[in-house]
């Protein structure tokens, strides 16, 4: 049975005991509203580690002034049931006041990796992500931490944070989990209308078009971006916010493609903003 831990102090006590006995800890940080994408990471951790910890914490620091922190879906009872079914040992669900008992005296600034793509549209977002992940790593002290490749920019930033701050954790990137028709699983999909849900499948189809162009030898980013944009414009009613080609994990905008690349999409429907990506090319 999955145990619910609600305080930092109790979580640290459990972790210290586990470390003394040589127990390996796998960790999946989440903001809740869990779906199959999260559960895939939990299953991976359960198959590899002695203890699997899932955090459910809606982090206020990664919400901007025009983003509604209070409206973010919270369903801790359902989340607890879901992770129990796939074998998680602990759900860590602290209060905001416990994670941030006072005003932070040190601001974390991510730098260039956060100045592009999602970071450019949501200033301060990745500073908040890195702050909370840093704190969670210090509390849970995992041997392995699991992040989805759907948030590929976040994954690149967390990997850089681990390197820069010498965290003794290995980051495991988990492939995007998709619906049968190709739509990337996301907590935001529930906000799509029936028509938008039918259209949303074309995000992944446009990425497959980009991949096909690349495999056919196309190396001009503008050509790929234009073709993907044209495809989306003819298949969806949502507003196309971004179609971009960047190196990965360096996140440098590419004009003439060389090496490994990251093709990123962002589309705003009436009540849901969806992102998707594909990583292709040699390392």
Swiss-Prot record:
ATP binds at residues 31-38, 148-151, 177, 185-188. Pathway: Cofactor biosynthesis; (R)-pantothenate biosynthesis; (R)-pantothenate from (R)-pantoate and beta-alanine: step 1/1. It comes from the Bacteria. One of its GO terms (biological process) is pantothenate biosynthetic process. It is found in: Cytoplasm. GO terms for cellular component: cytosol. (R)-pantoate binds at residues 62, 154. Keywords: ATP-binding, Cytoplasm, Ligase, Nucleotide-binding, Pantothenate biosynthesis. The keyword Ligase applies. Transmembrane segments: none annotated. One of its GO terms (molecular function) is pantoate-beta-alanine ligase activity. InterPro entries: Pantoate_ligase, Pantoate_ligase_C, Rossmann-like_a/b/a_fold. The keyword Membrane does not apply. SUPFAM superfamilies: Nucleotidylyl transferase. Gene3D superfamilies: HUPs, Pantoate-beta-alanine ligase, C-terminal domain. Beta-alanine binds at residue 62. The active site is at residue 38. Catalyzes the condensation of pantoate with beta-alanine in an ATP-dependent reaction via a pantoyl-adenylate intermediate. Belongs to the pantothenate synthetase family. Homodimer. The reaction proceeds by a bi uni uni bi ping pong mechanism. This is Pantothenate synthetase. It comes from Staphylococcus aureus (strain MSSA476). The lineage of its organism: Bacteria, Bacillati, Bacillota, Bacilli, Bacillales.
